[in-house]
Amino acid sequence: MTTSYQEVEKQIDLIEEEFEVKCTCEKGCSACCRQLIALSMSECLAIKPYIENLSKDEREKLKRKVLEQCHILEENNITNKVINTTRKEEVIQDKYFKLKMPCVFLDEENSCSIYKVRPSLCWSYRNYGDKADCEKDYDVESTIKYDDWEHRVFERILTARPPRNGLYVLPFAIKEMMEW
């Protein structure tokens, strides 16, 4: 995980401690990993070395998952690779959530295989209520998405690598980046 992410997570932990709230998220839950995950191409580039270091068999398995998910998304008219911050995003999120597709990076134990470089959308999302609620809807009242910090980090990323700005649906981003 990058230093910026670590700083943000420490700040979130301090807020939780100060307000005496406990995040109910835990390793292996993975309900939120069935929501639409959008990321910048810069975040995608941070993931690339992890993919490149996989064994040939693991890379092929990931490639099959990515291509299968892209196909399912296209069949369900989720063809937009870039997500905009508009009403259209909510419609796409709803359609995606109903598909109940697990993130391509979830391993057999329902843990994130790229945890150290997971997208900002993933590390900035925390649930403080019943974990079962995350199975029912992508917009859970007891969750907090620490958007402000996420946006600050995202701005840094965009400044560092301005070409191809925007947010991409994870399977499409990986497919494009890996040229699959």
Residue ranges and their predicted role:
Residues M1-W180:
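Short loop/turn segments that flank or connect secondary-structure elements
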